Amino acid sequence: IAERDPGLLDPTLGAGSEALGFIGIASLVAWGFGYPGQPHVLARFMAIKSPDYMAKARRVAMSWVIIVLAAAIVVGLTGVFAVPGLVGAESEKVFILMSTTYLHPVLAGVCLSGIMAAIMSTAAAQILVASSALTQDIYRGLFRSSSHGKELLWVGRGAVLSIAVLAFWLALDPERTVLDLVAWAWAGFGSAFGPAIVLSLYWPRITRNGALAGMIVGGATVMLWKQGSGELFQLYEMIPGVLFSTLAIVLVSTFERRAD
């Protein structure tokens, strides 16, 4: 592997053995900021049977993450020789090609089913959480507090269909890889909801309007940063999104409490 591309074994080097630099390293580290803002992840915390299970859940989750990410690295490095010549978006097919090329059809089918299971599990969780938020928090909470039963059921179904169609439309962009889409969505959720969630837990002075301002500013920053050009805008949009969202929450909450 070192003879083929030394950059594959050096965490400070990118493609073509070029140094990542501050922007590259900071962008990689920034992925961790996104976890507190993922609705489908937060739903797991909310659904836990008892806070006493948190320590056990943490051990299970971290063990699973370490195994999965380590295996992903091994698959990628093995693919350099097993299926050479994959570049750009084609490199995302390395696991599929290795499974169908080197495994028995039955085992290959199990591996491919695993991919679909992971996709469907995450997609279903995100769509259901988004549908619930649109139905209960926005439609019923802001517009029709008296709605219930079949009305909410049909609104929820419409929300599920609309979100699925929107996701399908975004996925049709031929210029983007799966990783590009995931990174953008990860930054959007992390910047919009992450700072509000964390500060709600650890900063008692946060206000309702402060949290709302943080969500709006964080989401808008990610959208606008993606449209910028130049070296500075190579920085992962998660970083400015979280930064500006946090500032918005602190400033609005502070001014609001002073006014009171």
Predicted features and spans:
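Membrane-embedded helix-loop-helix hairpins and adjacent transmembrane boundary segments
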Residues: 1-260
